[in-house]
Amino acid sequence: DCDERPTNALTKIVPYLEWDTDYQITTDISSGNNEKFNDWSSQKQFTPNITINQPYLTDSGLNLPMKEGDTYFFKPGLGTGKTTWLIDELKKLHQYRKYALGKINNLLFQFIAKTDGDFCHYQEHDGYILKKDDNTNFALCINSLIHFDSEDFDGSIIIIDEVMSVLKQLYSPFLGSRRNTVIRLFEEAIRRAAIVICLDGTLTDNAVEFIKELRGKDKNYYSVLNEHKPNRFNITILQTTDTNSGKILMNEMSGVIKQILSHDEPVFITATSQKNCETLDRMATSEGKKVIRLDSTTSPNECMKRFLSNPSEYIEQEKPDLVIISPSGGEGLDIPIKDYFVAGYHIGNCLNADDNYQMIARLRDPSVPRYLWVSHKSFIVDNDNKNTESWHDLWLDKVANLRDDLGALSCEDAKEAYRERIINYLDSPHSTLEPKLNWISKFEMNHLRDCLILMLQKAGHNVKFGEINNCKETKQEIKETKETIIQEEVTGIFNSEDIPDTVGKRWRTTVRD
């Protein structure tokens, strides 16, 4: 494996179990005696009632009834053809209207392309007109649920790929003032559907129990686990050290950026920060390299839609030196191209372990060596100093906040309405799922690298450790490039047209909520 790695890049490569204590997860964690890590691990469990071990779901002989009242939970291995299998199954169920719900459009665009016209995107394809046609199947972000009525979901099939991300989005502040409406319509869609299909490579019992609570006890439930572990990657976790002193530099990524730019052959990069993606793009472009970058600023353009519809074909046609993917393309994106990239890199300094794990697997080719630079904790951490030893603490916080809000009201009618809202929340499955998901995310962000390594090892990947030296010149170039990008953004905002008061008020409401 070492012969395939970039030369003059790594000063040390050793198996993970031989890491010294500066790098290795502490003994009490790795031996399973750490209570917090045990709690975290238990929250990630998935309990199937059907277990298979097949390289591809399409060849598994999996024979499921797919009848009204059924709910299916699939935890497939990465690269086992779950989308192809799902589309084949949906074609057999032509008598039902179908809704594919997602968190972000990028995954939905790729799904639509694979269905060969069986689905349309609500925002892109005049959904407000087509929704009157019962034969039209929709793919939509959960944000767009507000454009539907509860009755629209009667007797339909609801498909939720990457269901864990969708559930997290339900409690996200980004839904703003629409949050309660989105949650209500999501609940109605799950309750009213004839069949519900949920899929996720990181699916947990928490999500399963939540959907069951919404669906009711009179339904049939099937939880399917594919134990096959394809695409075992050779992964090197990179740790930056000072060139002169040998001191470990915990959050220094200059050496990784320098190594990425030193390649003469194509490389694939994922990064959890859009700003890092754009910075790397500019630095590579200034050296004459051709770059494909997918992030929130580029995904709406037509080129990126072509990329999403068939990534391998687009890469073969455009022949980029670098492909850079941000979290916008980190979930569900399937890039099966083989023998094109010589290395894959991941720069993980934001988000939680689940999100980082998903991004690493976007490039399917197992022959490509992977290099991960991951900070010990996420740069975006909620440092509220509250006691969050377990998800129960977050639940207590939520209840206390609701109680405080109630006490601040003066009108008796308002108090009664809010009291009823509190009771409804505490009686709902949201009161359990929301604090659990929040606690898991917070824990992973505070122990990002350790959690990610444990997840990669559990998935069967070959994990090693490598040191890489820092580079002061590259660090300075990164700093200057980011400053230029920020200055351009500020100038663009300054020169933009004034926002109407109505839009500004709506934006403030969204941010506040």
Describe each model-derived feature in a short phrase.
Residues 115-152, 306-309:
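Inter-Walker segment of RecA-like/P-loop motor cores
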Residues 341-370:
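Conserved SF2 helicase motif VI
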